[in-house]
Amino acid sequence: MKVFNKNGNEINLIQGTKDIVITPNPGYELLYNYSYATDELAFIIAGIKKNNGVFTMDDDDVARMDVTCKLGTSYCGLGNGTDWTVNSIGYAFISSNTIIIGDRNSLGTQDRAYINLVCRLSWYKH
């Protein structure tokens, strides 16, 4: 959505944001990425697909980011290839620049992870 000031000039609602680049590791595919960083926080909004098999409790290191974060953790939605429906709850961890995904219920049927996670960037100091 575009926003304009009283003089008709376009303005940014969030100043100083940077897009975060996510690179999937071999065996994984990036479905979408709307992730960005401010001066102190990273907002990870992404979908990752496991190409061969499904997510399990043993999955780790599914992708890398071009920013470094302090530890972040959140639940994530898990689905399968039939549609965009979330069928199960998994977990997402961010450690340094690594994204870790796992199926906390070990259903053995979910190959897509939908991540919405906020964590602090490692260079931010109070």
Predicted regions span which residues?
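Extracellular jelly-roll beta-sandwich "head" domains, especially the C-terminal globular C1q domain
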Residues: 29-31, 48-64, 72-126
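A short, structured loop/turn motif at beta-sheet edges
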Residues: 36-39, 68-72
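Short, hydrophobic/aromatic-rich segments at coil-to-beta transitions
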Residues: 13-19, 70-78
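Extracellular receptor-binding modules and their adjoining Ser/Thr/Gly/Asp/Asn-rich linkers
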Residues: 1-61
